[in-house]
Structure formats: structure tokens, C-alpha cells
């Protein structure tokens, strides 16, 4: 899984590298798809959910813009503009093992500090959750840490952040979506134990308004009901006997976990 995670880490960097005003979300998709293919991996998003005549999800990434939270479909006609908030979610399979990761970025300069703070709060919540993950902990500890971080950021920033429920993280390994579901709200000491060998995708989604969502007519794109902008952050992690390792971060999560005093377990 670490090998798949490193491929995806490089792909996400490539996708971020082409984000600019005047670029289509399909161009971001294609940049990520090229890195995945060059590594001998395949996308686990493309044709996800296919059944019979239904081809499933039509792209390598989810490209969600502004009020789109998750599962946005890339398009050659969806042209990014300065100030847009783009969430890139992608995954790959290498040698039968899956990886899944997401990042939110602004196109050019952010239109306001509240949007800068939104992305920072979402990323911090992800890292707070990951920092609690270790052998003999419980899933509720991780979920509570995400929720608590969002609430703390809201107080610190003087803003309302909506923590999206109903969408969240998941187990990952020989399939992209496996048990358990990883909610972004929870209670400490509750839920299944985190045991060595377990792999999870940790992915908070927060909004600048209320957390209520709706799905668009394409059957995929999830947006905020109130039209507020949203951010999404995600890494795939592994629980080991000695702690946690971030599979989809080139540094195994060292930079993100440092502020929590956590040193990730190297798997390279």
C-alpha cells in the first residue's frame, strides 16, 4: 500500500501543478491520470460503481469547485477562474492495493482570509484525527479529534464551520471502500479498536456555512445546500504496532504530525 500511496502522492503534486486560471478541471484530471499510468498503476475512481450499462464514475479524479463538496465530475468545459476553491480527490491501485487522497487549493490568490482559514481548518482536522490513530486506540477517538479540531478552529477564527456528516473516511486495502466507515464526528472511547494492520482513509469535509448537503442531478456531485464553499482533505494511513504511518504522504506524514508531537512510522 505504501507503493500505491507514493504513486498517488506524486500524482496529486502533478495535479496541483497545473491548477491555474484558464485551466479546465479535465486538464487537472489528465495530469493526475498520466502519473498514475506512467507508474503502472490504475485509477480506482474511473468506472467506480459501474453496473451493467451504467459505466460508473467517468473520470480519474473528483474535481469539486467552490460549493461542491465531493464527487464533482471533471469537464473540459469547466474552466477554473482566479479565486475558485478546487478540491482534488484521487485514488489508484498498484499490485492490488488501493490508495486514496484529497487536497483543497485555491486558483491563484484566495478571495478572502475566511477561505484561507477554511482550507487550513480542514487540513488541521485531518491531521488531528491521524495523530490520534495508533494501536489500541478506538475509532471514536479519531472521529472526536476531527470534530474537536473543527470546533476549536471555528472559535479561534471567529467563524462558523459546518462539519459534513454522512460522508467521511473508510477502511482501505484490497478495495477502495472497506469497513469501517470513519465518521468526522464521534465520542472518545467508542467504536471499534484500531489494531495493527488496519488501514484507513481519513477525510474531513467542512463548509463556510451549514453542513447540510444535496446531490446534483448527475448522480454524483454533492454540494452545500446553502451555497457556501467547502474544503476537503484526505490521506490514507496504516496502523502499525509502533504507531501510525501516512501512506499517501511522501514524508509519511512527518510535517503534518509534527505539531502534535507525533513521529510517523517509516514504511519505506
Can you describe what each PLM-predicted range is?
Residues 2-268:
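Active-site neighborhoods and metal-handling regions in enzymes and metal-associated proteins
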